[in-house]
């Protein structure tokens, strides 16, 4: 399609080198890798909006299920998670910014921790968060 300048994969869109490659190219660029090829790390992303009460912390991305009706594994890759220590750290930063409610987000939250060497369930993660951050008034779970 002549109107398309570049195609960028979900993993590649997060890499600064992708945009340098596009900028330096004089022709359309296809930068879509195999999303199942290697395990992608996800970093917790603090989502802050000034003058808001609710802060979002991504704890999981991707999905290991291959439901016939769903495209998520092909767009997000296999399930991967952020470790509990980093999650607590991110929530603490949001609480310091006076957020009153924290929302843990992910594509398939129920799979949280299944890829960890020391398996940890979502309920165990919630207990860790509440024990380490007693000042947290509200904790919500949200999934796609």
Over which residues does each language-model region extend?
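Proteins enriched for Cys/Gly/acidic motifs involved in redox and nucleic-acid/cofactor modification
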Residues: 1-112, 127
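Active-site core of PLP-dependent enzymes with the aminotransferase class I/II
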Residues: 115
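Alpha-helix-loop-beta-strand connector modules within alpha/beta enzyme cores
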Residues: 118-139
């Amino acid at each position: 399609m002549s109107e398309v300048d570049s195609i960028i994969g979900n993993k590649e869109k997060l890499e600064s080198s992708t945009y340098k490659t596009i900028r330096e190219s004089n022709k359309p660029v296809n930068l879509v890798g195999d999303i199942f090829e290697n395990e992608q790390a996800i970093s917790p992303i603090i989502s802050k909006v000034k003058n808001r009460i609710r802060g979002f912390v991504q704890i999981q991305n991707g999905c290991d299920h291959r439901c016939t009706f769903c495209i998520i594994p092909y767009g997000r890759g296999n399930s991967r998670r952020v470790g509990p220590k980093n999650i607590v750290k991110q929530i603490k930063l949001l609480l310091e910014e006076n957020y009153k409610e924290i929302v843990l987000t992910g594509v398939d939250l129920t799979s949280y921790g299944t890829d960890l060497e020391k398996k940890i369930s979502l309920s165990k993660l919630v207990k860790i968060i509440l024990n380490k951050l007693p000042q947290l008034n509200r904790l919500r779970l949200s999934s796609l």
